[in-house]
Amino acid sequence: MQTSPLLESLMEALRCLPGVGPKSAQRMAFQLLQRDRSGGMRLAQALTRAMSEIGHCADCRTFTEQEHCTICLNPRRQQNGQICVVESPADIHAIEQTGQFGGRYFVLMGHLSPMDGIGPGDIGLDLLEKRLSTEAISEVILATNPTVEGDATANYIGQMCGQYGILASRIAHGVPVGGELEMVDGTTLSHSLAGRNPIKY
């Protein structure tokens, strides 16, 4: 079936979004054109501005329109002494929603993966080391993903912290709240057993 070249271009562009295949892109394109052209225009303007104006924080590397993000500029967080290392800006959002962390962050934008040719310099570990050597940091909390690559990255950073006498800790991994043991995979259950906590009375 012949369709408009512009429509084809729109559907192809929408496929760059994660989880969007040809059918989903087609539905989105027709929805915008048939029922929500004003929404489509707002989306286009927001995308154009975001792509051209959002960069990376000079300190933690998260997304921001300024040279430094609001978290890094917060005096209370600067005095906290803790840095939480995460793989992506989305991880910061998830941790901030808990309200349990009051320090600053460092975003790797990935993890170590020798098989893919991703080394320490590719995920900004030279910048992290500079912070470790120049700032008053009391603890580095390693919140990389519980994968082989995430664990390897955490171990590498942990050794780096040791060179500067800085405490490094790894976030706990285990059985999710409300989960049933029979539904938990073996690796997660192993982590839960190894990282068990004493009951305090």
Swiss-Prot record:
Cleavable signal peptide: none
UniProt-recorded Gene Ontology molecular function terms: DNA binding; zinc ion binding
Residue ranges of domain Toprim in the record: 81-176
SUPFAM superfamilies: Recombination protein RecR
Record keywords: DNA damage, DNA recombination, DNA repair, Metal-binding, Zinc, Zinc-finger
Matches recorded under InterPro entries: DNA_Rcmb_RecR, Rcmb_RecR, Rcmb_RecR_Znf, TOPRIM_dom, TOPRIM_RecR
Keyword Zinc-finger: yes
Pfam families assigned to the protein according to its UniProt record, in alphabetical order: RecR_C, RecR_HhH, RecR_ZnF, Toprim_4
Zinc finger (C4-type): 57-72
One annotated GO biological process: double-strand break repair
Family membership: Belongs to the RecR family.
HAMAP family with a match to the protein in the record: RecR
Record's function text: May play a role in DNA repair. It seems to be involved in an RecBC-independent recombinational process of DNA repair. It may act with RecF and RecO.
Protein name (Swiss-Prot/TrEMBL): Recombination protein RecR
